[in-house]
C-alpha cells in the first residue's frame, strides 16, 4: 500500500475525515486514528471505540491546557515515551455518565470551545487530554504533537482526538495490519516522519543568528549560533572541517546539564570536553543544546545525590532538545552521522529531518 503524503493527510483532516498516522518502528510503531477535534461527532467516537479499541485521547497545546487549568497527571513522568497525560476530564454540562459516545463528543466540544474555561469541565472524566510540546513534531515525534499539528495545518483548532489501533486479539496493530485496516475502512495512512519532513521544509523552530571562529583548548572551531524561535533560547554548533552531504560526519549532540557539565557528575563517556577533543582530532560537529533548568528538577537532583538515590531518572526532559538538535544538524547539511553516544539509544523519526545514524561511537 502506498503511504499518503503529509499534504494528503492534512487535506483529509481539513475535510473532517479520519486518518491513520504511524510512528517509527524503533518507537512504539503504533498507528493511531486521528480526527480534528473541530470535526468530532458521536459517530466518530463510536468508530474509534469499536474499531480502534485503544484509549481515546484529546491532544491539546500548552496554551489550551493552561486555559482549562488542566494539571498534569503526574509531576514526574517516568513513562518510557513520556506520554504527557493531564487529569482526565468531562464536560460540566450536557452529559450523563460521561462514557457514552454522545457524552464524550460533548466533552471534546466543551474543551476546545474558543471561550472554554476551567468552569466548563470537571475532573476526572472519560476523555484523556494529552499536552503537546511547543514546536509540535519538530520538538517531539509523538502522536500527541502530530494530532495538534495536522489540525493546525488544516486551518482548524490545533487539537485532535486520537486512539491507538489494536488487532482483533487485542495486540498492537503494526504496519501490515494497519495497511489492511486502512484499505478496509477507506482511510489514508501516513507517517509522523513524513509530517516532520513536511514541517521541516516549510517551518522551522530555529534561525541562524551568527557565525564566527572560536579558539578553545582543543583547537579552533567554526561556531554557528542559533536562536529557538519559540522560547528564544540560544544554541551552538561547533564545526571542525568541511561537511560533505554524502560523507559520514562525526556528530555529538550535547544537552546542557548543570551537574554533568560543571560538577562532572554521572558516568557518561562523552563529556563536553571529551566530545570537543574527539571532534577536534577527527573533524565533525558538536551541537550544544541549552535549556532553562527547572529549579524543582535541580533541587530534586541535589536531594537524590544527598540520599544516594538510585531510582530511575525522569525521562521526559530531552525530547524537545533532541528535536532542536536534529534541526540544527539538518541546517548544517548533515545527512549521515557517526554519533558519539554512551549507548545505542534510538532517536525517533530522524528520517523526517533527513538524518541517518550509520554508527554509534561509544568509545
From Swiss-Prot:
InterPro entries: DHBP_synth_RibB-like_a/b_dom (IPR017945), DHBP_synthase_RibB (IPR000422), GTP_cyclohydro_II (IPR032677), RibA-like_sf (IPR036144). GO terms for molecular function: 3,4-dihydroxy-2-butanone-4-phosphate synthase activity; GTP cyclohydrolase II activity; magnesium ion binding; manganese ion binding. The record marks 126, 164 as: Essential for catalytic activity. Pfam families: DHBP_synthase, GTP_cyclohydro2. Its cofactor is Mg(2+); Mn(2+). Mg(2+) 2 binds at residues 28, 143. Residues 1-201 are annotated as: DHBP synthase. Binds 2 divalent metal cations per subunit. Magnesium or manganese. Residues 202-363 are annotated as: GTP cyclohydrolase II-like. It comes from the Bacteria. One of its GO terms (biological process) is riboflavin biosynthetic process. Pathway: Cofactor biosynthesis; riboflavin biosynthesis; 2-hydroxy-3-oxobutyl phosphate from D-ribulose 5-phosphate: step 1/1. The keyword Metal-binding applies. Keywords: Lyase, Magnesium, Manganese, Metal-binding, Riboflavin biosynthesis. It catalyses: D-ribulose 5-phosphate = (2S)-2-hydroxy-3-oxobutyl phosphate + formate + H(+). One of its GO terms (cellular component) is cytosol. Mg(2+) 1 binds at residue 28. Disulfide bonds: none annotated. Catalyzes the conversion of D-ribulose 5-phosphate to formate and 3,4-dihydroxy-2-butanone 4-phosphate. In the N-terminal section; belongs to the DHBP synthase family. This is 3,4-dihydroxy-2-butanone 4-phosphate synthase. It comes from Photobacterium phosphoreum. The lineage of its organism: Bacteria, Pseudomonadati, Pseudomonadota, Gammaproteobacteria, Vibrionales.
